[in-house]
Amino acid sequence: MSPVPAAGIFLQMTMTSSLAVRGLLWTILLPGFFAGFLPWRYFGLRNVVIDGGNPRHLLGVAAIAIGVVLLGACFLEFARRAIRTLAPVDPPVLVVQGLYRYVRNPVYLSVTLIVLGEVLLMRSMALRAYWAVWFVAVNLFVIRYEERALRRRFGRAYLRYCATVGRWLPRRPTQEHSGWNS
């Protein structure tokens, strides 16, 4: 037997492991850092006592739960399609399935919902300001960097996608979805 197939399998496993670690790090860096660590550490989220009779608290818990479920669905979509990264900075393919059929930025939207839920749990002006800064910063990043990079990389397919799928507000999918990657 030639050592080449074993070396090829090892190389593939190493690349897959490396990409998985990178994806996991990105997962921790974006949602974990911005929606988890910062509010927990610097805005007092760790001191919140949820009052089940408080409608604002119930709405906050619902927003966090929806954000977490949507975020999980996004990551599962990437994993299911064996996409090599979860980072928005180097997408290998244009993802238009799953939640991406309805909204172009479901990961950012999910994190925004989670932080909004945290705002509803607390009466913190600092956390409200943080949420507003997060939302503005994400918009600027998406519009000034990510969308431009995706237009350069995917051309007409991305332009068609943008024409039918909202950046932040979900839209009903059209029949055109099947031709976006062509």
Predicted features, each with a name:
Residues Y102-L109:
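Histidine-centered phosphotransfer motif of kinases
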Residues S2-Q97, L109-S182:
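Membrane-anchoring alpha-helices and their flanking helix-loop junctions
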